[in-house]
Amino acid sequence: KNITHILHFPAFEFYIPDRIMQTVQQERGMDMKQIFVSSTLLWNAGLEEMFQRVYDNGFDGIELWAQQFFARGYDTQEYLRLQALYPLRTCVHSCSWDLNLASMNQGIREMSIKQVEASMRLAAELEAMELTVHPGHMTLPGRREESMKLLQDSLEQIGRLSDRIGVDVSLEIMEKIPKE
C-alpha cells in the first residue's frame, strides 16, 4: 500500500500524450513503481487499451474511477482478465461527481454513501488495493460544525461498510474546487 503518486492531469482527460508519458518517466529519475495513472486520462479508451498504454509506459498501476467504470459499462470479468495479463496494481477512486458526504440534504448524503458502497463493492470485485473517497464539502458557508458532524457520521457508516466488505478506504485531501 505504498502509493506515493497518482497522476491526474485534468487538461488531458481524453488521452495521455506520448510526450507527457515520456517526460514523466525520464525526469528526475522517478521510480515508476510508485506511480499510478488515473483512468480518467483514458476516458474514451476500452479496458484493453487502458491497460496496454499504462503498462507500455512503465507505470505500476491504474487508479480506476468507479464513475468511469459504471458510465462506460466496463465489464468486471474483462478487467480481471486484463489484470491477470498485465502486472499492474489497481486502486479504485469512489464515485464523487454530484455527491456530497457532508450534505445538509439527507437524501443527497444517503445517496452519496450508497455510491461509495457501490464503488467499494467494485473495488472488492476487482481485488483493488484500496478505495479513495472524497470527503464532501459544506453545503452553506459558515456551517462548518454542522458539516463536519454530518461528514463524521457518513465516514463512520463508510468505515462499517469497509469492515464488512473488506476494502481499505483512504480519504483524499482536496484542494478548494467548487462543489468538490
Question: What positions do the PLM features span?
Answer:
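Short intrinsically disordered, low-complexity coil segments enriched in acidic
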Residues: 1-6, 12, 175-178
